[in-house]
């Protein structure tokens, strides 16, 4: 995580807010909205197309030919976790049942031309689809559970967006740091989270990025520390690329958008390419 990554999320939050309107709907993406160019045929006429536009923008912004990580994609692959957490939160605003992420992947990402954009530097990944699939274990977490990581992620990202090379005084981030640690603590004390190896990896990514933020500050002595006793195995000092298990099942290419209204339960087949 860095300032540029979080500014990209801020760009999305400003034009496509992460909460519903007063009428309980997603915000519109109009012609003047930069995300409109990421909509298929320049038309985001459904809620899921709006979410897909934001998702594709973030993937392209980070890993595209002129993206944030164009020269070091491998060492920053964990940014994909944050994009998927954003996706989970946006889907969870209306559908809180099961694992809708799996169906979203099948319909909007897998075998879609725009996700075939090539990338370099990540072993086993030739395009965006491969990169996302490398984190496929996250899509097997129920959407309700995965979206719980969104609040601490956003607090941390807001800290990074304030901080920069021209502003290493982190006193303005203290309240956000307290907010992050409080939300992180809630997750680390949730047995359903800590008993899940995939969730533990996300906790590690968050805690490492928080600790890395503190190291960059001129004075972070007043920042609260993170207690990690419940995380197993122990988090590595640096976030690293995690290998995804390759589980082979058939994916139907005939899914329609309507399929997404039905949550995927734990009894459904695992995600595969």
Language-model-detected regions and their locations in the chain:
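N-terminal targeting/regulatory segments, especially signal peptides of secretory
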Residues: 1-269
């Amino acid at each position: 995580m860095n300032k540029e990554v979080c500014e990209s999320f801020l760009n999305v939050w400003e034009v496509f807010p992460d909460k519903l309107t007063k009428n309980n709907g997603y915000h519109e993406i109009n012609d003047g909205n930069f995300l409109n160019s990421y909509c298929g045929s320049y038309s985001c006429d459904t809620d899921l197309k709006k979410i897909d536009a934001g998702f594709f923008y973030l993937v392209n912004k980070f890993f595209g030919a002129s993206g944030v990580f164009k020269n070091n994609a491998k060492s920053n692959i964990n940014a994909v976790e944050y994009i998927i957490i954003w996706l989970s939160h946006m889907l969870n605003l209306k559908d809180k049942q099961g694992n809708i992420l799996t169906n979203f992947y099948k319909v909007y990402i897998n075998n879609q031309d725009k996700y075939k954009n090539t990338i370099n530097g990540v072993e086993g990944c030739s395009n965006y689809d491969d990169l996302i699939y490398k984190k496929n274990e996250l899509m097997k977490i129920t959407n309700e559970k995965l979206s719980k990581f969104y609040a601490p992620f956003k607090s941390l990202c807001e800290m990074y967006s304030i901080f920069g090379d021209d502003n290493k005084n982190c006193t303005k981030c203290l309240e956000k740091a307290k907010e992050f640690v409080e939300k992180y603590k809630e997750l680390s004390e949730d047995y359903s989270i800590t008993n899940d190896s995939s969730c533990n990896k996300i906790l590690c990514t968050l805690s490492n990025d928080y600790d890395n933020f503190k190291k960059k500050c001129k004075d972070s002595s007043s920042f609260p520390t993170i207690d990690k006793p419940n995380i197993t195995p122990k988090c590595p000092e640096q976030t690293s690329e995690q290998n995804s298990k390759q589980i082979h099942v058939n994916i139907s290419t005939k899914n329609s958008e309507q399929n997404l209204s039905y949550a995927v339960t734990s009894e459904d087949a695992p995600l595969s390419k």
